Amino acid sequence: MLLPHFKKSVLALCLFPSILYAADTAPTVTLNPITVQAEGNWLDEANAQKVLNHAGARTVIQRDELINRGATSVKEALRTVPGIQAPENAGTAGSDASLSIGVRGLTSRFSPRSQVLVDGVPLSFAPYGQSQLSLAPTSLGNIESIDVVRGAGSVRFGPQNVGGIINFNSRTIPETFAGTVDLTTEIAENGHVKFSPNLFVGGTLDNGLGLALLYSGVNGEGFRDKNDDSDINDIRLKAAYAIDEYAKIEANLHRYDADVDMPGGLTPAQFAENPYQSLRNHDYMKGHRTDGSVKYSYKKDDNAFELLAYHTDTFRDAGMERSGSKLYQTAPRNYKVTAIEPRYSHAYQLGTTENEVSVGYRYLHETSEEAVNRASYNTVTGPTNEYAWTKADGKTDAHALFIDNRTDVGAWSLIPGVRFEKIKTTENMYKLNKDASVLNGVHTEKSYDAVLPSFSVMYKANDLWNIFANYGKSFAPLQYSQMANTNASGAYLTMQGLQPEKANNYEIGTHYLDPYLSLEFTLFYIDFSDELKRDDATQTYSNLGATEHKGAEFGFKYNLGAISDELSGISLYANTTYTKATASAGENKGQDLDFYSQLVGNAGIDYKIDQWTLNTNFYGQSGQTASGTHDATGRYGNIPGYGLVGIRASYDFSNTQLNGLKVGFGVKNLFDREYYTRSADQVGGMYVGAPQTYYLQTSFDF
């Protein structure tokens, strides 16, 4: 039984500061009164100081950094974070509406192993039953900062957190009326143009009510010759009301719509002929999401309380030709999620120690409705005579409880914690006749109870430098798609023999922060047992057995003003990650995993003089492999490494007749380096990367 072990864990956690106090044999001294302050939810108001005080690997990127680096998508923004790999669009993940990121060698397709949030609300359709981002309902233009917690976060946020927590913070409501209108225009080598318009306007009234309207879009053609259009609209309405100086209520209402083409992969012969062509004229991804959230927060002295409630309603559909057949397939899906999350933190003193205990609970209910339809297909007329193939419905009820306690003893901080997950998932899968009547069906359900301990320790060498180490256990339930499937004969169960994913994460590292230099260095090790591996060609899963991921991350930002005031306009940044990700059991033991680079890095220089800002940046990654029997489709084989250089110049018209106007011009892939990736899924093939691309940024603040 897991529950008795859970009770023992909680009891030990609660007694932990008392044990430290009892063990303190130092002489009694008179101390000045100390005011303890509860921190509460440490995802709130993420900044460099919070990174310094976090006992794990963590990186926060602010909006101005993203602009200076010329990032025009969330994928490009995340590439600047140590440990993250964000591949080019490929396969069924081949659209601007999807998001694929892999952390520390973990699989990147649709970001399945990181808990991705927007303002604390899960971004995925269904956090437990379908934790993927084939539709990622967020846009870079509406983001204030990106907070990437790679270690020491699993106890508070889960499941699906072996790859850490990524929280996109939307733009904050200004204290006074203000707004920005901006437009980024990208021009590809083939003359195709893509526009990214953004609007932000808001302010706070004298009575404490704040309102803001955010809009971000992507409209136009990509760099492929055909079937590469994007039409994305992302709008968010935010409200906040300060009840008094300690309490406030915040609300979000959000709508996201996307209709994007997927140009598809090429065989090696087609790629050699023209890597930018598209021979799949009817593949697409479309969808929409409506969501709302309300949060009440209270913080006064030693107490902090937060209550978050949210509801999401997501629809997505993808249509694509099935390679090697004369069939076309669509996959409409609907998901609804409702959740409530109370959290409470209390700071207290016990003898010479300062403590903060935090407890939280979440109840989440999600439902799914999934279907697959097929049609006859040829490349000229497209799909015709659509008929039903399968349908499925599922639901999950999940309870999660966490408790952790931070104890500060001199220069040391000790943070034990435990998370308890109780999950029940059901799935009904039906094979349909062409007229949508049921041929046969199967029903399955699975329940999970998991106790997930964590422990972090941090040593404060001084006010600028911390050293940390941590351990955390993560857990991921089976997804709806892993529980049952169909073939031409009927529906059948696929979960026999499959085990939930479990992983042990270890880190040791350091943070440094002063007015001129910020630095991070982390050694990591992930012991991933019972990792589920997807066979993209057959769309089935198996327990690979185990994988291990180990490596090192290093990053810094440095302002040369530390050397001389005359150099204060020059800033440098760089980060690099070395990862070794291998199978540690089974027939592939010792072999590298697919679709990850052992070495990834980026660097840049920012130079500001008067009203000019000049930027240059570099991104590079080593080669990858897509293991499998080489064939004419291009699915399998080596993927060469590459490096890309970008430049940008901008001018701020402040203190002129055009006050508020900013204009920037840049070039991505300056030397027009040709590179590619592969996809081993049902679409498959080779995918060329973005060629030399020019972009123009214009914005006006009012």
What are these regions (language model features)?
Residues Y344-A347, G351-E354, D408-L414, K422-I423, ...:
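Gram-negative outer-membrane beta-barrel transporters
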Residues L199, K295-K300, A304-M320, K460, ...:
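Membrane-embedded beta-barrel scaffold of Gram-negative outer-membrane proteins
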Residues V74-A77, S100-G105, S114-D119, L133-S139, ...:
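N-terminal periplasmic accessory domains that precede
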Residues T180, G191-P263, Y284-K295, H346, ...:
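Transmembrane beta-barrel wall of Gram-negative outer-membrane proteins
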Residues A318-M320, T390, M429, V438-K446, ...:
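Outer-membrane beta-barrel domain signature, especially the mid-to-C-terminal portions
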Residues D244-Y246, L253, A347-E366, A392-D527, ...:
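Structural signature of Gram-negative outer-membrane beta-barrels, strongest in the C-terminal barrel
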Residues V121-R150, L237:
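Short acidic/polar hinge/loop motifs at secondary-structure boundaries
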Residues L43, K50, K75, R79-P122:
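Extracytoplasmic beta-strand/coil segments of soluble accessory domains associated
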